[in-house]
C-alpha cells in the first residue's frame, strides 16, 4: 500500500454555482435548467419571488411542485441521467504493458495497491500484463469500451461479489470478463 496524498485545492477549478440572475426574475421557475449542463439555477433562499421547496417526492419539471404525473416522472429521470452523463471525466489510464498485454487487470477503489503489485509480480515472471484502475464509475470514462475490448483476456478483480464486473457487462455490449472476487480480504 502507499500513502494517500491530499490533493492541492488550488489545482481544482473554482466552484461557481449557476445563480439566478436579475434578468431571470420574470421567468424564473425552480426547475429551470442550464441547457449546456442540465444543472438547475440556484436561487438564494429568502429572496422574494424565488421560493423553492425541497423534498424527496418527484417534482414537476418546471414549477417544482410535487407531481405524480407519469410523463413528468419519465422526463425527470431522463433529465437527471443526462446531467450525470455530461460530467467531464478523465480517460481511464492503462499501466504496465499497455500496448501488447495478453491480460488486462481491472479494478476500482481501494484495490489499486494490491492490483498494481500483482501486475508488477506477473511482469517480473515474464507475463505481458496491464492494469486499468477506475476512479470514476458513473459516468464511466469515455474510453472505457475501447480499453476493455482491446485485450484478449480481461479479469475484473474485486473485494466483493462482482458488482463492478456486472456493471461493466451492463454498460458495454458483449463484454465478458473473467472475475476474481475475494470477499474475505
Regions found by a protein language model. Give the residues of each.
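Flexible, low-complexity linker and terminal segments
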Residues: 1-185
Amino acid at each position: 500500500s502507499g500513502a494517500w496524498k491530499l490533493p492541492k485545492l488550488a489545482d481544482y477549478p473554482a466552484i461557481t454555482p449557476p445563480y439566478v440572475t436579475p434578468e431571470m426574475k420574470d421567468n424564473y421557475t425552480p426547475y429551470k435548467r442550464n441547457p449546456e449542463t442540465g444543472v438547475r439555477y440556484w436561487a438564494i433562499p429568502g429572496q422574494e419571488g424565488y421560493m423553492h421547496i425541497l423534498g424527496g417526492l418527484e417534482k414537476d419539471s418546471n414549477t417544482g411542485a410535487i407531481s405524480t404525473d407519469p410523463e413528468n416522472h419519465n422526463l425527470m429521470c431522463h433529465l437527471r441521467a443526462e446531467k450525470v452523463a455530461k460530467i467531464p471525466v478523465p480517460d481511464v489510464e492503462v499501466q504496465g504493458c499497455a500496448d501488447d498485454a495478453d491480460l488486462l487487470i481491472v479494478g476500482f477503489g481501494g484495490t489499486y495497491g494490491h492490483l498494481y503489485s500483482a501486475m508488477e509480480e506477473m511482469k517480473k515472471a515474464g507475463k505481458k500484463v496491464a492494469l486499468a484502475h477506475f476512479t470514476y464509475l458513473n459516468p464511466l470514462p469515455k474510453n472505457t469500451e475501447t480499453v476493455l475490448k482491446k485485450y484478449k483476456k480481461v479479469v475484473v478483480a474485486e473485494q466483493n461479489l462482482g458488482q463492478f464486473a456486472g456493471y461493466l457487462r451492463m454498460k458495454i455490449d458483449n463484454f465478458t470478463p473473467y472475475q476474481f472476487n475475494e470477499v474475505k480480504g
